[in-house]
Amino acid sequence: MAIQSDSLSSLPDSPRIVAPQPVSPNEESIERALRPKALEEYVGQQRAREQLEIFIAAARKRGEALDHVLLFGPPGLGKTTLAHIIAHEMGVQLRQTSGPVLERPGDLAALLTNLERNDVLFIDEIHRLSPVVEEILYPALEDFQIDILIGEGPAARSVKLDLQPFTLVGATTRAGMLTNPLRDRFGIVSRLEFYNTDELARIVTRSASLLNADITADGAHEVARRSRGTPRIANRLLRRVRDYAQVKSHGVIDQDAAGRALAMLDVDPQGLDVMDRKLLEAIVHKFDGGPVGVDSLAAAIGEERDTIEDVIEPYLIQHGYLQRTPRGRTATLTTWRHLGLTPPAAASGGTGELFSK
């Protein structure tokens, strides 16, 4: 059973269908319904899954709390799901919150003092904990104790409270922003990687079954290959493709129906959407492939600088469509090919690694 305190995510102002973050509160509730409950149901992340199977089995045999767990990686890959699975496999409750919600030491103390033996406390966006709250967390993680201040002024005194043994599961998309003292207190650290197409197809097939949607193997594969390696995106695209199939394809999601539905949604075979293509086309057509500064690029496409840096660019850089250089953003040969264009002779002939395969 999970006990959740406050909303765990700040929703984007302009949701994209290929956004890796949740785009609505309703989507979060659907995710909970589709979430696997046990490690044997969890698809992908083989290394992390195998490690957790061993560590959980050992902790249960000893009757101890699992060591503290840090999960990091891009959004939408299953960090929250793994936290729930850990609690389920340990047979304990999960209490769920997020770094920005814990504004004062008392907020964290209230959670910690209400934990039962071996419970799991899940803190999403743990890199956003305030320093004063983080200080309270250190003795709780090491010694299962916290110090609280009673009274005010000269009469104030510190009281040490014992806590039940518990497991902290921290999740972050920015492991580099964690302080060293906090990072060092996690005994189990797992990085979640993007999923391959076969793994996503298995997830899509499972989700379709739970949604009572009729899907073929090639239909699941078509949804999977456009999902940018991210289960959250795969499940979102599946729901939209299901709607299309019910109206246009007699309810059956095959490769043709999935392809037509995703084309209607402007998600191309590589998973790029309108915003991705708008940025790449601006670099190629307006700036001759770059380099171009991010402020000039923002003005050219009518988007905020932060939107480009935080929302659009990461996927394009990770998958080789775009490079950041000291002089600005530059389109790679992959971009020119994707847009069906021939790169300038100077670009294709003398740019070294930018245009090498």
UniProtKB/Swiss-Prot annotation:
Binding-site residues, DNA: R305, R324, R329
UniProt keyword terms in alphabetical order: ATP-binding, Cytoplasm, DNA damage, DNA recombination, DNA repair, DNA-binding, Hydrolase, Nucleotide-binding
The keyword 4Fe-4S is annotated on this UniProt entry: no
Location of the region described as Head domain (RuvB-H) in the Swiss-Prot/TrEMBL record: 269-357
Broad class of enzyme this protein falls into: hydrolase
Disulfide linkage: none
Stretches the record annotates as Large ATPase domain (RuvB-L): 13-195
Alphabetized InterPro entries for the sequence: AAA+_ATPase, AAA_lid_4, DNA_helicase_Holl-junc_RuvB, P-loop_NTPase, RuvB-like_N, RuvB_C, WH-like_DNA-bd_sf, WH_DNA-bd_sf
List of residues binding ATP: L34, R35, G76, K79, T80, T81, E142, D143, F144, R185, Y195, R232
Domain characteristics, as noted in the entry: Has 3 domains, the large (RuvB-L) and small ATPase (RuvB-S) domains and the C-terminal head (RuvB-H) domain. The head domain binds DNA, while the ATPase domains jointly bind ATP, ADP or are empty depending on the state of the subunit in the translocation cycle. During a single DNA translocation step the structure of each domain remains the same, but their relative positions change.
Family: Belongs to the RuvB family.
The protein's name in its UniProt record: Holliday junction branch migration complex subunit RuvB
